[in-house]
Design a protein with these regions (language model features):
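Active-site cofactor/cluster-binding pocket
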Residues: 1-140, 567, 691-692, 701-708, ...
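Short internal beta-strands
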Residues: 1-2, 555, 676-681
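Acidic, Ser/Thr-rich peripheral helices and adjacent loops at domain boundaries
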Residues: 1-13, 370-400, 572-574, 693-718, ...
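Short acidic, glycine/serine/threonine-rich loops at helix termini
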Residues: 3-6, 31-34, 214, 229-231, ...
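Ferredoxin-type iron-sulfur electron-transfer modules and their immediate structural context
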Residues: 83-335, 340, 348-568, 572-638, ...
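Thiamine diphosphate
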Residues: 101, 214-218, 430-435, 535-538, ...
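Flexible, low-complexity linker and terminal segments
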Residues: 137-160, 186, 196-225, 233-237, ...
């Protein structure tokens, strides 16, 4: 009762509403050990609870046995193919919900109000207590509009949007231009809270952190903001913002050099002795002998230090390494957990055995601790270059690839996608979108600021001496002066017409144009562009560090549902969705318009300014005038192209690989320099219920697939969209990449941005509900599908050469010269070859294709997968020899077995469907084609080819092949010729 808000209590009492509670999540967790089902099955508990408390059963005279029989029959229809155990577990959850639903006791309306479900955070002195805050201000950004920037139009203001969509109108939502035009303010998810959406939350253990950045790279929800700081900065931030007494604040600040020195000494001792002493304990010890200020102030200072998550013990690149090279230079590293977290636990899984993050139950006290931490973070400066190692914040392209994760230590990059949206917990798409946004911000923002400084300087030079320079030009070369004035009037002052005659008329109507007018026009445009690129506040309340560096055009799909459903969208930049298939062409239009604006507002004004300032007396010809008045990207330098705002086309494998494929193909062929595309490859129509796409594996596996005697899934080879752009599409930059390898992923994005042409990235993205995996598995599944050759990594960079061998890079795939990657079972050390069958065994969507064999004595009647794969090629499948019992390539349905890692890591034997074996063959063939393009000689392919030539010619009998396939294969492999036999 105390957790219900006053308005709800009032309505409950007035309307005599009965209120019930149900421990649905607890019930579901006890019913299954599958993490992906433990939260989702609570819906079955609600089903039972609903029928228990509603009058339906009583009104229709249905007893409990009849009710359970009806429900069981429905479960039989839905889950019967999965076996009786699945039906019984669902029945157990339902009946538990029926029996455990409890009516709460209605209390007094004046009872204590704990409806926020939150504890009280420790806030800085500048922040008012929650009770004194205006509605919505507790989480709002506080940066004012910069001087010289006009107020935004109402349709783009977050406040106006919130007044309509965050004001509890419900079904009484008023009609407005926002709704009529389907317009949202940008980045509204920034002020959202996911507190009620998560059951558990990650807890940061600083003493175990190594600053590997893996957790931060995989987090889909911008929920792990982080930074590195000098020790002194942390100490002074705590003193200046949390110690109330002004006098004591000054005294403590005077002691900071001594506190910092003592703390650093203790830190060095702890690191040298490999101790895990927490940072707050060291600060407490360092201040223990200091006096001259009150105990209250000491307590206030130490209290916030205890709440601030500070790591030093194992963050060698931040503390130990710098300290060793230059004593006194080591810093500290912090990870904060924000209220945007959905509790997916992807970060905890990525952290793994480091144990620097642990999932804990979300409680009022844990929430208060996290809110305290993020409030402290907002007071800290951004991470300095000295803590970023070989990541170059001013020139990210020059960074070492292994350090590219460090770009996420810079807050302006980290906040490039704000999250707060309604994407599923752990959504693999979000991790990719966040990387796209953060890398683009990291790449473009320094270019913008350098451009702004350059423009500001040139505008100043024009203001100071431009008129005199024009007068000198008129005296020396009157024709060039006249042509220069005409060019500025035409391109900058808006007096150009559709033809020479039209322009002449416009100029005559305007009247005389003085040299002062020309200089003022050029300088004004340069000054405005300088402001726009460095000082403009693009979004309400956010940093005033320049206009957006990118825009996004989206194909309809999951990304547009969570990307544009009021009230929370994650995009702090221009974003548009039109139709399912036309995101690519919309993005192309964006790119063209950006190039026109860039030419008119930046390139042409700067070039004309340079002509006047640096090239006085050089010829200004009629051809120059023509070029300026018919300007295009063909005339831009590489540097001018880099400074172009970028466009990212985004969509799923359905929108971009199926129905919208022709649009994407068209855009790739144009090779526009600022248009890039990323396909979020969930391998299924995730948003519309699980239909197959061309990118869906041969197994199908989605909700819309049938499995039985007539069909075992999709049955068609997988289309890898990225591979189709390696030929016949001009010269685009192409990559198939994912968060499986974050540094290489970030590098591919950077190289795509650098490339003067269209870029395309195909990124495998886990869809937890459609793939049947737990919320924390996006990283693991991306690695598994890569390692299995299901979605191998590659980068095709045309700048490297005009042959596939030069331009195509397969680095990052394990054992890239082999058919399959060889690994070991963790529990036994036994080696095995990791095929797509092994990846499929980890996703519930493929469960129909694998049957567990508990009695391993039965495998004597089955064929090992290794043996079977030696017997068969893709051409055997094309000719349907796999269906001929007399042929060497015959694949018996569930007559092939493999050992796969079980849930406990131990090997377990499974029989494979015929379709799964064919999927292995198909993926091997696709991988071999990639290898050949990259110039990699696969001796295993040669060995298999030579062996099968001998079998088909009768030199080796079919019986011997069946009995000794692996042995014969190894013999051929050891003596493998250098070329494939004809």
């Amino acid at each position: 009762w105390e957790r219900l808000p006053i308005w709800a209590r009032t309505e409950i009492l007035d309307k005599k509403i009965r209120v019930f509670t149900l421990p649905g999540f607890e019930i579901a967790r006890k019913a299954t050990n599958r993490a992906d089902l433990q939260l989702r099955m609570q819906g079955n508990a609600f089903l039972g609870a609903f029928f228990k408390v509603s009058p339906l059963l009583q009104d229709f005279d249905i007893n409990n046995d009849q009710f359970e029989e009806v429900v069981r029959n429905q479960y039989q229809k839905k889950f019967g193919k999965l076996g009786s155990a699945v039906i019984e577990s669902n029945m157990e959850v339902m009946t538990q919900g029926f029996s455990r639903v409890t009516e709460i006791k209605v209390g007094e309306i004046t009872a204590a109000d704990r409806s926020t479900l939150r504890g009280l955070p420790m806030l800085p002195l500048s922040a008012l207590p929650p009770a004194e805050l205006g509605e919505g201000c507790a989480t709002c950004r506080s940066h004012p509009l910069p001087e010289g920037q006009a107020e935004r139009t109402p349709v783009t203001q977050v406040g106006v949007f919130d007044s309509e969509f965050r004001s509890d109108y419900g079904y009484d939502q008023p009609a407005s231009p926002l709704a009529a035009m389907s317009v949202m303010a940008a980045g509204t998810g920034d002020t959202a809270s996911k507190y009620v959406a998560r059951r558990e939350t990650p807890l940061f253990i600083p003493e175990n952190c190594t600053q590997c950045m893996e957790c931060i790279s995989v987090c889909p929800d911008t929920a792990l903001p982080n930074c590195s700081q000098d020790i002194e900065t942390v100490l002074r931030t705590a003193i200046n913002n949390y110690v109330e007494s002004v006098d004591d604040r000054a005294k403590l600040n005077a002691h900071v050099p001594e506190i910092e020195k003592r703390t650093r000494s203790l830190m060095n001792d702890a690191v040298g002795g490999k101790a895990d002493t927490p940072f707050p304990e060291l600060v407490r010890e360092a201040t223990s002998g200091l006096n001259g200020f009150s105990d209250t102030s000491r307590s206030q200072f130490l209290s916030i230090i205890e709440q601030a998550p500070v790591a030093y013990n194992k963050v060698n690149a931040i503390f130990k390494g710098p300290e060793k090279k230059n004593p006194g230079s080591g810093g500290v590293f912090s990870i904060f957990v924000s209220d945007l977290c959905k509790g997916c636990a992807a970060c905890v899984t990525a952290c793994g055995d480091h144990d620097a993050l642990r999932m804990v139950a979300e409680t009022e006290s844990v929430n208060a601790e996290h809110e305290t931490g993020t409030a402290f973070l907002d007071l800290l400066p951004d991470t300095e270059q000295k803590f970023l190692g070989f990541y170059n914040d001013e020139h990210p392209v020059d960074s070492k690839t292994a350090t590219l994760r460090n770009h996420l230590m810079v807050r302006r990059n980290y906040d490039a996608l704000v999250s707060g949206d309604g994407a599923c917990a752990g959504c693999g798409e979000k991790s990719v979108l966040r990387a796209i946004a953060s890398i683009t911000e990291a790449y473009m923002r320094p270019l913008y600021h350098a451009k702004a400084d350059r423009f500001s300087q040139k505008a100043g030079e024009l203001r100071q001496g431009g008129v005199a320079l024009l007068a000198a030009l008129a005296a020396l070369h009157p024709e060039q002066h006249q042509l220069f004035v005409r060019t500025v009037a035409h391109t900058i002052m808006g007096l150009g017409g559709d033809s020479e005659k039209d322009t002449d008329v416009r100029l005559e109507q305007h009247g005389p144009i003085s040299d002062e007018d020309i200089v003022d026009a050029l300088a004004t445009v340069l000054e405005q562009e300088s402001f726009n690129h460095k000082d403009l506040q693009a979004l309400d309340g956010r940093l005033d560090n320049g206009q957006c560096v990118m825009a996004m055009a989206a194909h309809t799909g999951c990304n547009t549902v969570y990307g544009s459903t009021p009230p929370n969208n994650p995009h702090p930049y221009p974003w548009m969705n039109s139709l399912f298939q036309d995101g690519a062409t919309i993005g192309w239009l964006f790119g063209e318009s950006f190039m026109v604006d860039h030419a008119r507002r930046s390139v042409i004004p700067e070039r004309l300014a340079d002509t006047l300032i640096n090239k006085l007396g050089e010829s200004m010809t009629a051809q120059d005038y023509y070029d300026y008045t018919h300007f295009s990207d063909n005339l831009m330098t590489d540097e001018e192209i880099k400074e172009l705002p970028k466009v990212w086309i985004v969509g799923g494998d359905g929108g971009m690989g199926d129905i919208g494929y022709q649009n994407v193909s068209k855009v790739m062929l144009q090779n526009r320099p600022n248009v890039k595309a990323v396909m979020l490859d969930t391998q299924v129509y995730s948003n519309t219920g699980g239909q197959n796409s061309d990118s869906t594996p041969m197994l199908g596996g989605s909700d819309m697939n049938s499995f039985g005697a007539a069909t075992q899934g999709k049955g068609v080879e997988k289309k890898t969209v990225a591979e189709t752009f390696l030929a016949g599409h001009g010269s685009p930059f192409v990559s198939q990449i994912s968060i499986a390898n974050a540094p290489k992923f970030f590098r591919a994005i950077l190289d795509g941005l650098e490339y003067r042409g269209t870029g395309f990235l195909q990124c495998f993205t886990t869809c937890q509900p459609e793939h049947g995996v737990a919320d924390d598995m996006a990283l693991d599944q991306a690695q598994r599908v890569r390692d299995s050759r299901g979605a191998p990594e590659f980068v095709f960079n045309p700048t490297l050469g005009e042959t596939y061998e030069e331009a195509l890079d397969l680095k990052g795939n394990p054992h890239s010269d082999k058919d399959w990657y060889t690994t070991k079972f963790k529990s036994t050390g036994e080696k095995y070859r990791y095929t797509v069958a092994h990846w499929c065994a980890t996703e519930a969507r493929f469960r129909n294709h694998l049957k567990r064999i508990k009695d391993e004595s039965k495998i004597k009647d089955l064929i090992s997968l290794e043996n079977m794969l030696i017997r068969i090629t893709q051409q055997d499948v094309v000719h349907r020899y796999h269906l001929n019992p007399e042929h060497r390539a015959f694949v018996p349905d569930f007559g092939v077995f493999a050992k796969v890692p079980g849930p406990d890591g131990k090997p377990q034997v499974v029989a494979l469907s015929r379709q799964l074996v064919l999927f292995c063959v198909e993926r091997r063939k696709a991988w071999r084609l990639l290898q050949s393009k990259a110039g990699i000689v696969n001796k295993e392919y040669i060995a298999q080819r030579t062996l099968l030539v001998d079998v088909d010619s009768g030199t080796v009998s079919k019986e011997e092949l069946f009995a000794r396939a692996e042995e014969l294969f190894e013999e051929r492999l050891l003596g493998s010729p250098a070329a494939v036999p004809a």
